Regions:
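Hydrophobic helix-and-loop "lid/oligomerization" segment in the mid-to-C-terminal part
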Residues: 2-13, 21-53, 60, 71-73, ...
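Generic enzyme active-site microenvironment
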Residues: 10, 14, 84, 109-110, ...
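Short, hinge-like loop/turn segments at secondary-structure boundaries
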Residues: 54-59, 102, 125-128, 280
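Active-site cofactor/cluster-binding pocket
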Residues: 61-122
């Protein structure tokens, strides 16, 4: 990397703030080092990330743009170096999986997820790291190039650190994350601006979807210290759901006292997607990996199912007894209050 190279940065399907922020932050740094850089994503990114500097240059595979896949694949084919950010398995990049796998370019993995496939030539991998954005910052720091981090790069990286720690609230938040955030603020990151753009720029449709989910779709299973939410494809269409609109819905369940596991499943038509969030020592990633072709972190994981939404729900309910003791550990006892409201049971 001492000489200018054609660089492609690839991140996972449905990129979140850590995926896009780390990618654009790294891209900004590499451009300052005179590399020709193209960020490629295997799908669109959420609208609430469209403030990130450099987002307009992202080449996103979009089903509504017939040539976007071809252009993305061509960019990968032309690359001399490919950075793979925020994913440890090639199946996380969908239609770009084979182009990246078959590329003769040098591949560099920067990631913090468990059980990497080790497909890259070089790895900057740490499963104890809270975010990929934090690892990108560490990489730039270790190269002695912190002075290259300007406000644009800092804001992108700060967004990744902030969101993957749940606003510095999750158990993965350590002194290291605060130190990284402090250095990024020192380099020009604006915490209040980043927080507002990510958390406080909801559309009316997204707010109505959130209200509907919380009032009609959230189900509590007190005996398992568990909450689940199911959304059908028709329900998603009803609220004109856009990329990113369901982001964060799974987290609401964990705000209920005594809940240790929250699961959100929704019908994407071609498959059922599941998001898992847990508290304490409950391994959400093990459940996702064992039963739903997924994985991730101990307290934040994802999966999928080829069954129908109803069949997926029944499968999930059938396996909960297996985890009853684990879910009860350190769980606070609480009562489920049921009252009649307009002839309906309100939980």
């Amino acid at each position: 990397m001492h000489n200018p190279k054609r660089v492609v940065i690839v991140t996972h399907f449905k990129p979140d703030a850590d995926a896009l922020g780390s990618s654009l932050g790294l891209a900004g740094y590499l451009k300052k080092k005179d590399h020709a850089v193209q960020v490629v994503t295997p799908s669109d990114y959420p609208g609430f990330l469209s403030w990130m500097p450099g987002h307009k240059e992202v080449l996103a595979v979009n089903k509504d743009q017939a040539d976007s896949l071809q252009r993305a694949q061509q960019a990968v084919a032309n690359a001399e170096v490919i950075f793979c950010l925020d994913f440890s398995s090639l199946n996380r990049i969908n239609s770009l999986q084979d182009p990246v796998k078959n590329s003769t370019a040098k591949k560099i993995l920067v990631d913090h997820h468990l059980e990497p496939e080790h497909f890259a030539d070089f790895e900057h991998w740490d499963p104890k790291a809270a975010s990929t954005a934090g690892l990108v910052f560490d990489l730039i720091d270790k190269l002695g190039d912190k002075n290259y981090i300007d406000a644009d790069i800092a804001n992108c990286l700060y967004a990744g650190v902030m969101t993957d720690t749940g606003g510095f609230r999750h158990s993965n938040t350590t002194q290291k994350e605060f130190q990284t955030a402090s250095e990024l603020v020192g380099a020009g990151a604006n915490p209040s601006f980043v927080s507002k753009m990510i958390y406080d720029t909801n559309t009316i449709a997204r707010m109505k979807l959130t209200g509907y989910v919380l009032s009609q779709k959230l189900t509590v299973l007190p005996e398992f210290h568990t909450v689940y939410i199911c959304l059908s494809h028709d329900e998603l269409k009803q609220f004109n759901t856009q990329t990113g609109d369901t982001e964060g819905l799974v987290n609401f369940g964990l705000s209920i006292e005594g809940i240790r596991l929250s699961v959100f499943m929704y019908d994407r038509k071609e498959e059922i997607k599941l998001s898992f969030r847990s508290l304490g020592n409950f391994p959400a990633n093990e459940m996702a990996r064992k039963y739903f072709e997924g994985g991730g972190h101990k307290n934040a994981a994802g999966g999928s199912s080829q069954l129908s939404l109803e069949e997926t729900l029944q499968k999930f309910l059938s396996i909960l007894p297996e985890y009853k003791e684990q879910l009860a550990e350190d769980g606070e006892e609480f009562e489920l209050i049921v009252k009649k409201t307009n002839g309906k049971n309100e939980k």
